[in-house]
């Protein structure tokens, strides 16, 4: 039987797997990506793409391609709640930073605006990045078995186009093979939470809803019908305003049920105008889960993406978390495989990302449940008669004590959903604690709601804050100063000794450390003073930034032996022990 050898095998070619393949190739790692499917996603699926994820795609050089295909942030921001598109609109709110009270928060946080792009459009863009960097991706290549030993992992692969089987032997394997992960089940990863807590069906449609939506443009519409056996339908927009991918929740729905006539009835009811024609392109049943792997590493095998965390689509966190898993893991694998770091560095992947996965799973489930108070206040529930719905709506709009109470409850329900639509802190505010963050300091207390608001900091374990600086009159983000194939030391006006230390330590340890000097009339000119205000170290201090743009360490000043100090930190971070004092 044919045996192929590689350093890393990536199982799965969704958002997590393709991103891992692209980043590994960019880092010079010999890797192979496989998927049993014949191509990228064939339906919309995930769609909200937050700023951290766009930053990853920016780093991969494909942000421009993303913008060409995506629905931009400036037409994403109106969320409507109505009995149908043509019917009564009961509530409206702003989302994804579109509100006047949140717009500046989002603009200050990142050089990259978020966007709405369905998965079947996003995956080819990441695939383009992967191939541009030389990644090998094999379609129609199905994992059928795997086992690991002390020195590596052997995977049995079936070529689905020829039915031939062959083995791939790798040093490490990434299981990014989705919610039914064979890697997770075969290796024995344990999960916490609850599987299959609800059923839903997505229906990808061609339907022109321009006259109902162009004047109140948004990425998602919520439709609560006046008479139906479904609770609510949620309508993500795939292409403004003629392509949609609604999903329908119904209690007790049989798994796999795809009765097209029933679905056509739900769709007509949600549109509310019998003259609007539509065409069903694809029907996809799925389950709502609330689970996360207890650890993301067992031996030489790692989980990433939906293989590690599975949850409600609320908050739009799924593909974002998946891509960011890979952004955390790939540089660590590259560091270990190049000999720059000890294998123990790979333990920090689970230490850092598993708590993020747990937070995301819990937040998504909480947001899923937090739709119900609005529905209850609106008086629209699954299974009610049209007469009951009319009575409830008449009371809601009426001049009565009960009507006023319900209107207040309706507003409160919309406000509660801010934790789904404007959860900027959940999207951007990850804080890491692991051995890859040496000499950890206490994180600052949150000054605002930690889920709704992102609070930038340079405390180690925080993501590097974005501000604009200038180089030769060109505006540059601080995030663009970071190199994914190495570490970056950010210094100031008094940082020459740190720059020399970085060169010496990089040469001694054979680990790339680039430098960038920021400040007034420095290499990167801080004319506005925004960097000086946020850096939290002096002109003679420094920040050591990891390839994934998280701050590994900082020093507020200049010690007597900056080279020795930096050497000790790097050796500790890389799991190579400590140098003599």
PLM regions: where:
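Conserved mid-domain beta->alpha element of the FAD-binding
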Residues: 12-21, 126, 175, 280, ...
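Active-site-adjacent segment of FAD-dependent monooxygenases/related oxidoreductases
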Residues: 45-131
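Conserved FAD-binding catalytic core of PHBH/FMO-like flavoproteins
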Residues: 128, 172, 176-288
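Core beta-strand elements of the Rossmann-like FAD/NAD(P) dinucleotide-binding domain
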Residues: 4-6, 162-172
């Amino acid at each position: 039987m044919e045996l192929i050898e590689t350093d890393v095998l990536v199982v799965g070619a969704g958002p997590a797997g393709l991103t891992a393949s692209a980043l590994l190739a960019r880092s010079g790692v010999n890797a192979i990506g496989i998927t049993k499917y014949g191509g990228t996603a064939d339906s919309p699926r995930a769609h909200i793409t937050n700023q951290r994820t766009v930053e990853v795609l920016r780093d991969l050089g494909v942000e421009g391609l993303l913008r060409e295909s995506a629905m931009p942030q400036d037409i994403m921001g109106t969320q409507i709640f109505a009995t149908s598109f043509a019917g009564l609109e009961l509530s409206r709110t702003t989302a994804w930073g579109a509100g006047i009270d949140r717009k500046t928060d989002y603009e200050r946080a990142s050089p990259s605006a978020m966007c709405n792009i369905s998965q079947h459009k996003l995956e080819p863009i990441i695939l383009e990045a992967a191939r541009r960097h030389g990644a090998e991706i094999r379609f129609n290549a199905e994992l059928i078995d795997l086992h690991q030993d002390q020195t590596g992992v052997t995977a049995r692969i079936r070529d689905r186009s020829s039915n031939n089987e062959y083995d791939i032997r790798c040093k490490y394997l990434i299981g990014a093979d989705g919610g039914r992960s064979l890697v997770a089940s075969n290796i024995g990863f344990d999960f916490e939470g609850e599987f299959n807590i609800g059923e839903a069906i997505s229906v990808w449609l061609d339907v022109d809803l321009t006259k109902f939506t162009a004047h109140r443009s948004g990425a998602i519409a919520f439709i609560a019908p006046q008479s139906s056996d479904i609770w609510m339908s949620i309508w993500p927009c795939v292409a403004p305003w003629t392509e949609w991918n609604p999903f329908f929740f119904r209690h007790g729905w049989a798994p796999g049920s795809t009765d097209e006539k029933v679905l056509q009835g739900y769709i007509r009811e949600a549109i509310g105008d019998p003259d609007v024609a539509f065409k069903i392109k694809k029907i996809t049943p799925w389950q709502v889960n609330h689970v996360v792997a207890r650890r993301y590493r067992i031996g030489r095998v790692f989980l990433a993406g939906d293989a590690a965390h599975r949850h409600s689509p609320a908050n739009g966190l799924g593909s974002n978390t998946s891509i960011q898993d890979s952004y955390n893991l790939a540089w660590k694998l590259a560091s270990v495989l190049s000999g720059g770091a000890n294998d123990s560095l790979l333990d920090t992947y689970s230490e850092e990302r598993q708590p993020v996965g747990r937070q995301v799973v819990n937040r998504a489930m909480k947001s899923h449940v937090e739709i119900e108070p609005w529905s209850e206040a609106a008086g629209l529930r699954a299974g009610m008669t049209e007469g009951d719905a009319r009575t409830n709506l008449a009371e809601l709009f009426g001049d009565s004590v009960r009507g006023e109470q319900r209107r207040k409850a309706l507003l409160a329900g919309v406000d509660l959903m801010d934790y789904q639509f404007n959860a900027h802190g959940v999207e951007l505010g990850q804080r890491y604690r692991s051995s890859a963050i040496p000499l950890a300091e206490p994180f600052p207390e949150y000054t605002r709601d930690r889920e709704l608001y992102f609070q930038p900091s340079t405390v180690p374990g925080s993501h590097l804050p974005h501000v604009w600086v200038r180089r030769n009159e060109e505006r540059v983000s601080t995030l663009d100063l970071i190199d994914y194939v190495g570490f970056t030391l950010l210094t100031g006006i008094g940082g020459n000794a740190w720059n020399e230390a970085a060169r010496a330590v990089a040469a001694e340890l054979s680990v790339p450390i680039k430098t960038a000097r920021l400040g007034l009339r420095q290499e990167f000119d801080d004319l506005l003073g925004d960097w000086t205000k946020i850096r939290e170290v002096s002109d003679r201090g420094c920040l050591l930034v990891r390839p994934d743009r998280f701050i590994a360490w900082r020093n507020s000043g200049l010690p007597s032996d900056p080279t020795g100090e930096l050497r000790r930190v790097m050796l500790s971070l890389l799991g190579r022990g400590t140098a003599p004092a």
